[in-house]
C-alpha cells in the first residue's frame, strides 16, 4: 500500500535499532506514552517528588487549556526551587506502573520485531520516557521517540521545552501528533519504506487527531472508555464512515497483542 504525504525533516530522537531481517518491516506500530504505555499521566506522577507530594494553589491555578507544556515548565521551576533533583525525578518515572497487559504486548513485539517498526509519539518529555522504558527493559524496541525536549540545567533544575509549532486547531500549541505521524510516513516513503498497515495505540484526545488520518487498511487501538475511544464513537455516530480505520478498543494491552497475533496467523 503506497502512502504519500507532504513534509519531511521532522527533528526527533533516532535510536538506530537494527532489524534482524534485511527486508523492511511490514507494519508501523505507533504508541502514545501517558495513559497508554504507562497507567498514569507522568506529569501528574512527578508531583510525588514535590514537598508534601503536592503543588501550591497558585501553580495549579496557572493552567490554561491548550498550553499544558507552559504549565509544566512552571511546575518544574517550582520543584527546582524546592530542591528536587534529577535522581528524585528518575526514581518516580522508573516506578510508574505500566498499563495492564503492556508487558505481554512488548514481549510479543520483541519476538516479532522484524515485522514491526515501532515509534512513540508523546506530549510528555524525553527524559521521563527514556527513564521508564529503560527501567522496564523495552527501550530498544523503539526506532524513534518523538516528545518534548527536556534536560537539567546548571542549577540542576529539570527544564522542558515545546516539541514544535504547528497550525492544527485541535491540538496543544506545542505538539500535533498528526503532523508528526504524517511527516514520519513521508520521511520513510522517501527512504523507500512503505508500510502495509499502520497500527495506533493511544488513549487521549491528542491521539484522536492522528488516528483520523489512518486508512481503511489500518487499525486504531483506543483505550476503552478514554477520550480517544469516546471521540471515535462520537464521529461514527455523527458522521458514519468518516473514520476509516478499524477500531479495536482495549482494556488490557494483551488484547492488542492477541489481535496482532491473529493478524500474523492469517498472513502465514
Swiss-Prot record:
Mg(2+) binds at residues 32, 34, 203. Substrate binds at residues 43, 123. GO terms for cellular component: extracellular matrix; extracellular membrane-bounded organelle. Keywords: Hydrolase, Magnesium, Metal-binding, Mineral balance. The active site is at 32 (nucleophile), 34 (proton donor). The keyword Magnesium applies. Pfam families: Put_Phosphatase. It comes from the Eukaryota. Its EC number is 3.1.3.75. Phosphatase that has a high activity toward phosphoethanolamine (PEA) and phosphocholine (PCho). Involved in the generation of inorganic phosphate for bone mineralization. This is Phosphoethanolamine/phosphocholine phosphatase. The lineage of its organism: Eukaryota, Metazoa, Chordata, Craniata, Vertebrata.
Amino acid at each position: 500500500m503506497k502512502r504519500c504525504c507532504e513534509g519531511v525533516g521532522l527533528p526527533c530522537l533516532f535510536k538506530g535499532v537494527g532489524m534482524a531481517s534485511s527486508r523492511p518491516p511490514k507494519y508501523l506500530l505507533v504508541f502514545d506514552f501517558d495513559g497508554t504505555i504507562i497507567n498514569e499521566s507522568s506529569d501528574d506522577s512527578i508531583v510525588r517528588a514535590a514537598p508534601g507530594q503536592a503543588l501550591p494553589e497558585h501553580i495549579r491555578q496557572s493552567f490554561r487549556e491548550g498550553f499544558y507544556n507552559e504549565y509544566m515548565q512552571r511546575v518544574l521551576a517550582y520543584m527546582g526551587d524546592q530542591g528536587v533533583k534529577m535522581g528524585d525525578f528518575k526514581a518516580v518515572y522508573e516506578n510508574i506502573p505500566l498499563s495492564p497487559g503492556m508487558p505481554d504486548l512488548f514481549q510479543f513485539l520483541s519476538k516479532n520485531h522484524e515485522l514491526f517498526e515501532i515509534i512513540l509519539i508523546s506530549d510528555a518529555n524525553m527524559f521521563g520516557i527514556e527513564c521508564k522504558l529503560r527501567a522496564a527493559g523495552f527501550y530498544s524496541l523503539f526506532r524513534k521517540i518523538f516528545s518534548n525536549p527536556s534536560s537539567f540545567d546548571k542549577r540542576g533544575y529539570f527544564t522542558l521545552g515545546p516539541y514544535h509549532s504547528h497550525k492544527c486547531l485541535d491540538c496543544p500549541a506545542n505538539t500535533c501528533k498528526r503532523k508528526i505521524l504524517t511527516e514520519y510516513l513521508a520521511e520513510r516513503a522517501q527512504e523507500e519504506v512503505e508500510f502495509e498497515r499502520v497500527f495506533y495505540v493511544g488513549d487521549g484526545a491528542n491521539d484522536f487527531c492522528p488516528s483520523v488520518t489512518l486508512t481503511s487498511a489500518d487499525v486504531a487501538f483506543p483505550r476503552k472508555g478514554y477520550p480517544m475511544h469516546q471521540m471515535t464513537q462520537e464521529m461514527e455516530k455523527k458522521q458514519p464512515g468518516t473514520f476509516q480505520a478499524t477500531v479495536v478498543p482495549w482494556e488490557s494491552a494483551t488484547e492488542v497483542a492477541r489481535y496482532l497475533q491473529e493478524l500474523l496467523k492469517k498472513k502465514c
